[in-house]
């Protein structure tokens, strides 16, 4: 399969740079997986699409202010993007500089360069950085860090992004990017879903900066997926198994919830799904056998990205590309702050040939 098979034309004007004034007021394009039929509506229509007893699985990660500016003590400017917090004092990060710092290099971080840190080791493209400060990493990031808006949102971060670029149920700090499908859920909608009898469960996947890395190979099968930490606790496993036993659907809110659930299913030895607390490098593309997820809430993804491949594996390649073509024609808003899709599983997707 070629990466270019997942390309589509997207006018710049359709990339959303700000969210809607109300979280749940965005548009919703529904794609019926088996037939490919499309329905246009608004996000609150989700209430009519879910049945009592269906299970919504959310990702409760919280975005950290992971972008830091500063300079090397020797003079050159640097930009640091935290990939993950290793412990109370150390981070693993991407560093942009005219010349990469060497182990032992002193870094002065923050807009006022008030935080002292040391680059202690290099691991491939990532740098290990230790803060020389009494405060925890999270406290330091909260005081000097910027919200790491995706590269296609072409503006500086604003104070409002600290809340707007978080889901209302975010709980566990650690992500470099928001699980954006969840941004559309506000408290009134969640309350209505609960009142209808829709069940809810929460996984954790700390989205890494790798989510924005382009696929740099021509053939999909050659791509090496970035690694992210995921948690699927026992209560989620119980909720999934109970929903399946009732004949209800498991609906993943966002591709990160999909990747968490399907990672836990892949690693399970005795049951459909078992608890999972580990790094995952799961790469879902056409031909993948879904085991857990029956429906998906997701935003519109970048051309040639691993996420449009994941959706194609779920709904079918042809149905997905047709839906994206319709979304462009109907001027849906794309990417992190954009509109959403509701997709049901296409069991024939696994047999579909792509790019032939």
Swiss-Prot record:
Keywords: Cytoplasm, Queuosine biosynthesis, S-adenosyl-L-methionine, Transferase. The keyword S-adenosyl-L-methionine applies. Its EC number is 2.4.99.17. GO terms for molecular function: S-adenosylmethionine:tRNA ribosyltransferase-isomerase activity. It catalyses: 7-aminomethyl-7-carbaguanosine(34) in tRNA + S-adenosyl-L-methionine = epoxyqueuosine(34) in tRNA + adenine + L-methionine + 2 H(+). One of its GO terms (cellular component) is cytoplasm. Transmembrane segments: none annotated. It is found in: Cytoplasm. Pathway: tRNA modification; tRNA-queuosine biosynthesis. It holds the Pfam family Queuosine_synth. One of its GO terms (biological process) is tRNA wobble guanine modification. It comes from the Bacteria. The keyword Lyase does not apply. Coiled coil: none annotated. Transfers and isomerizes the ribose moiety from AdoMet to the 7-aminomethyl group of 7-deazaguanine (preQ1-tRNA) to give epoxyqueuosine (oQ-tRNA). NCBIfam families: PRK00147.1 (NF001140), queA (TIGR00113). Belongs to the QueA family. Monomer. This is S-adenosylmethionine:tRNA ribosyltransferase-isomerase.
């Amino acid at each position: 399969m070629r990466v270019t098979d997942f390309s589509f034309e997207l006018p710049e004007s359709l990339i959303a740079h700000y969210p809607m004034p109300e979280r749940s007021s965005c548009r919703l394009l529904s794609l019926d997986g088996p037939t490919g039929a499309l329905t246009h509506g608004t996000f609150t229509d989700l209430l009519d699409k879910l049945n009592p007893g269906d299970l919504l699985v959310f990702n409760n990660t919280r975005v950290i202010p992971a972008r830091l500016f500063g300079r090397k003590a020797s003079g050159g400017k640097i930009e640091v993007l935290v990939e993950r917090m290793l412990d109370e004092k150390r981070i693993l990060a991407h560093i942009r500089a005219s010349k990469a710092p060497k182990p032992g290099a002193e870094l002065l971080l923050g807009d006022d360069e008030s935080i002292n840190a040391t680059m202690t080791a290099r691991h491939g493209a990532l740098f290990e950085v230790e803060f020389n400060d009494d405060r925890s990493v999270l406290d330091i990031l909260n005081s000097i860090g910027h919200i790491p808006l995706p590269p296609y949102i072409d503006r500086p971060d604003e104070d409002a992004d600290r809340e707007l670029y978080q889901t209302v149920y975010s709980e566990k700090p650690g992500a470099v990017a928001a699980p954006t499908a969840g941004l559309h859920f506000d408290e009134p909608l969640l309350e209505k879903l609960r009142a209808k009898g829709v069940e809810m469960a929460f996984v954790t996947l700390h989205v890494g900066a790798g989510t924005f890395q382009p696929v740099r190979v021509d053939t999909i099968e050659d791509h090496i997926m970035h690694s992210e930490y995921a948690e699927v606790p026992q209560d989620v496993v119980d909720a999934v198994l109970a929903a399946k036993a009732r004949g209800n659907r498991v609906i993943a809110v966002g591709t990160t919830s999909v990747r968490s659930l399907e990672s836990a299913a892949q690693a399970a030895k005795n049951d459909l799904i078992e608890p999972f607390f580990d790094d995952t490098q799961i790469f879902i593309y056409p031909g993948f056998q879904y085991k857990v997820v029956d429906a998906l809430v997701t935003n519109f993804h970048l051309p040639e990205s691993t996420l449009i491949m994941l959706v194609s594996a779920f709904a079918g390649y042809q149905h997905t590309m047709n839906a994206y073509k319709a979304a462009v024609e109907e001027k849906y808003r794309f990417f992190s702050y954009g509109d959403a899709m509701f997709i049901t599983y296409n069991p024939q997707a696994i047999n579909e040939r792509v790019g032939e």
